[in-house]
Amino acid sequence: MYIHERDNWTNFRWDASEVSILQEVVCRKQGLLYGRLSTLGFDSKLRAMAENLTHDVVYSSEIEGISLNEEQVRSSIARKLGIENVKYTAPSHYVDSVVGVMLEAVQNYDQPLSKEKLCAWQTAFFPTGFSEACEIEIGQYRTHEEHIVSGIFGREKIHYIAPSPDLLESEMQRFIAWFDGEDTVGSVIRSAIAHFWFVSIHPFEDGNGRLARILSDMLLARGEKSELRFYNISSQINKDKKHYYDILERMQRGDGEITEWLVWYMKKMIDALDEAETIVTTILNKSFFWQKAASVPMTERQTQMLNLFLDGYEAKITSKTWASLAKCSKDTAIRDIQDLVSKNILVEDIPGAKRPTYSIVFDSEDITQFFTDVCITQENGIPYLTALFKGHRTVCERMLALDAERYQKGELPLSNMLNKYCSYLMARDQKKAKLFEEEF
């Protein structure tokens, strides 16, 4: 028996004690993230949002086996948000349509949901009326039975049979009424329920998964009362697709007890918020760097290369890497680098090394004096820089794996590592270093 075949099937139940613990963690991390974002100017916030939405659109499509050009998505979002100085890659009409759906949903999060809106969004996903070379119904609820299957033709495995077409109008009316109704459980739980509820109805022939994730984002935006989105769950689901589909299948064969789904969903939310912290740290450090370096004369090539590394490109800064990325000769790369060293923009990691590597100078003074108990830890295979800042503040910053490896091998000095990952903590006035952020 499938869940929708039960009476009152949407009276979902869960273990409140287990779920509330994770809900508190999510809410705390949301608060920390938005506290950090409050230190950014509006332009920097838009850039952070654009990067997040780029990942959301790309990975939400990738979950369904659809590959989008990331640069096209980024360009489309930047243009629609009015962000300048972004490398432009002309997006396809399809990419523009998909991006338009996401932006409409989050920018109008406080507007009521409707059948017409959902149908228009689904149409945008399939402008030609085809999905994987098969003609599908678009702009309307499906008119045929829907079986979720896998395997080769003739030996398919049925994972789920959705409600029959004659039930879709009433099922969706009930869903939309709940979606626009009073929030009695908190936006995090509501977003998880909306996701599960919508994909279980499966109202369209295709596009249901992407719409479910968009609706989840909408409810999170409502809960935060903000159209600015800085984290997304799609990238985390994409990393764990097998568990995603396995849990959905178990819950859809269950009796409405959805604790397992809520726990999994909120753990992915926590991962998404941690990833967003990394993006924000990168933007904070980059902003701090350019405040200091704004008056330093540089060529366009030097500026582009610095921005590439400031945005987290994972590679050592060497003349060979510089020449390859900048598409210039090695001699030109050496001149570029030496010029920036002379201007205190780059510093040699190990002075006199046979094959020198360089780090970007965020703060000209050694900030190691402000940090104690510095170490590198691992969590789920991801390296983190942990330290105590000014004797009372615990810092935990996600690192590039290459930097963690180089530090442990003695190739990256502690001062340069702290400079790269913790500069946002320090601002400078005309006389002394001071705290850039007191509280997040």
Predicted features along the sequence, with ranges:
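Acidic, low-complexity, intrinsically disordered interaction modules
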Residues: R393-G410, N419
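Polar/charged side chains located within well-ordered beta-strands of beta-rich proteins
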Residues: Q122, D336, D403, N419-S423
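Mixed-charge, Lys/Arg-enriched low-complexity segments
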Residues: L412-F436
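FIC/Doc superfamily catalytic core
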Residues: M1-Y384, L388-H392, K431, L435-F440
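Short, intrinsically disordered, low-complexity terminal segments
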Residues: Y384, R398-A401, Y424, Q430
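Hydrophobic side-chain positions on well-ordered alpha-helices
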Residues: L340, A387, D403-R406, Y424
